[in-house]
């Protein structure tokens, strides 16, 4: 078994420059933090198709902010057997703010850029998972941790020494909130 490979995709500046991470194994892939805006999600779909031919099995969300899950719809539509997940405490944060955010964000970015009904993740109750074909490379959920919210999940790939960190680490810019 080859080690898991990780790739990143940066969204547009309009989409708050959020980073989406794709982890690809021998027989399956998983995506972390789908983007905020529909055009960015459509770009992610094309990027995944260019990057790998293995099926996308799941999409995970690091925390409850909309720029990390709002436009999962086009991605899940492209891979209809894929599921959207988050740690239970992340799902609780999404539930707490969902109705308000669904009304607010289209007023700023336009209804053409924000899904009318963003899909909500289902709670992932486990501390790790494995991709088919790469059972020797677990992906471990760490959290809740403090990122730019108090309910952040990091995803640790110990064999590959990779961390998917969402908004717990910043590089070239400061987050808007």
Name the predicted role of every residue range.
Residues 1-9, 109-114, 134-139:
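Short Pro/Gly-enriched beta-strand edge/turn motifs at strand-loop
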Residues 2-50, 154-167:
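Conserved beta-strand hairpin/beta-sheet module of binuclear metal-dependent hydrolase folds
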Residues 11-13, 117-120, 143-146:
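Short Gly/Pro-enriched turn/cap motifs at secondary-structure boundaries
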Residues 17, 37-39, 64-69, 91-94, ...:
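Active-site environment of divalent metal-dependent phosphoester hydrolases
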Residues 22, 127-158:
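Core dinuclear metal-dependent hydrolase active-site scaffold
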Residues 30-33, 57-61, 140-141:
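Short catalytic-loop micro-motif centered on adjacent basic/acidic residues
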Residues 46-130:
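Active-site HxH/HxHxD metal-binding segment of metal-dependent hydrolases
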Residues 163-177:
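Signal/transit-peptide handling
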């Amino acid at each position: 078994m080859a080690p898991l490979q990780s790739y990143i995709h940066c969204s547009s500046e309009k989409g708050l420059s959020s980073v989406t991470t794709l982890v690809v194994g021998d027989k399956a892939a998983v995506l972390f933090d789908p983007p905020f805006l529909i055009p960015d999600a459509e770009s992610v779909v094309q990027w995944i198709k260019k990057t790998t031919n293995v099926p996308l099995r799941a999409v995970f969300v690091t925390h409850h902010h909309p720029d990390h899950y709002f436009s999962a719809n086009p991605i899940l539509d492209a891979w209809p057997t894929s599921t959207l997940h988050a740690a239970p405490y992340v799902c609780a944060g999404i539930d707490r703010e969902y109705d308000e955010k669904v009304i607010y964000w289209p007023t700023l970015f336009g209804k053409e850029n924000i899904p009318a009904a963003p899909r909500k993740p289902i709670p992932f109750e486990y501390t790790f998972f494995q991709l088919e074909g790469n059972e020797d490379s677990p992906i471990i959920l760490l959290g809740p941790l403090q990122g730019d919210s108090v309910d952040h999940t990091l995803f640790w790939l110990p064999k590959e020494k990779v961390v998917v960190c969402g908004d717990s680490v910043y590089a070239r810019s400061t987050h808007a909130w």
